[in-house]
Regions:
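Short N-proximal segments of mature Sec-exported proteins
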Residues: 55-114
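Sec/Tat signal peptide C-region and signal peptidase I cleavage site
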Residues: 17-21
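Short linear interaction motifs
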Residues: 47-55
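Compact alpha-helical subdomains of small soluble proteins
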Residues: 100-190
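Acidic, low-complexity proline/glycine-rich segments
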Residues: 24-48
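Bacterial N-terminal signal peptides
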Residues: 6-16
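Positively charged n-region of N-terminal signal peptides that target proteins for export
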Residues: 1-4
Length: 190
């Protein structure tokens, strides 16, 4: 009995391994959300993104946050453009960064008429602060240092993409909490 179960398990594991191997050989793995993503899936990802803390210096309001995210990803792409010895992966990161920045800018343009002067000023300050972080690296004449810095950029908070969608679509209700999407027990009513 155990030998039969072990043999069956091996067959399953081998077939899963083959399927994974074939899938990985088929090309890049898509990490962006598909166009057909369900509303529940978006709500779940949004709840997770908003439940995680933002990095130090990141604005908490959506509009300034999107401006900050745009400046960070644009700075990273600008740094990548300074490299003369880019490999194909670096070139792809620059391309994807430019697309992400374009998405952030289109969200900012769509939402700009609805923002107060104070929020717009906060967004400008946030973008300037993020851009200033890249300035010393962009000015560095040592390509090895620039290349290392380019490789160390860990990406943006997940909240950036959701904040961009929320300001573009004029969503003013608070994002769902993890408890509201079933990830945590809801707090007890007092």
């Amino acid at each position: 009995m155990l030998k039969t179960a072990a043999a069956a398990l091996m067959i399953v594991l081998m077939s899963v391994g083959t399927a994974v191997s074939q899938t990985q050989d088929d090309g890049p793995i898509a990490t962006a959300s598909p166009r057909s993503e369900s509303a529940d899936s978006v709500r779940l990802r949004e709840a997770l993104a908003y439940s995680n803390p933002l990095p130090r210096g990141a604005p908490t309001q959506d509009y300034p946050l999107v401006a900050w995210c745009d400046a960070l990803v644009t700075g990273h792409a600008d740094l990548g453009d300074t490299l003369t010895n880019r490999n194909p992966e670096d070139t792809e990161l620059v391309r994807l960064g430019r697309l992400e920045a374009q998405d952030f800018r289109s969200a900012l343009v769509a939402a700009e008429p609805r923002q107060s002067a104070a929020v717009k000023a906060e967004a400008q300050r946030a973008a300037a602060a993020a851009k200033a972080q890249w300035a010393p690296l962009l000015a560095n004449t040592d390509e090895t240092s620039r290349s290392q810095a380019f490789g160390l950029f860990f990406g943006l908070p997940g909240r950036c993409e959701h904040a961009a969608r929320r300001i573009r679509e004029n969503i003013t209700t608070p994002p769902a909490t993890p408890a509201e999407v079933g990830l945590q027990d809801a707090p007890a009513a007092e």
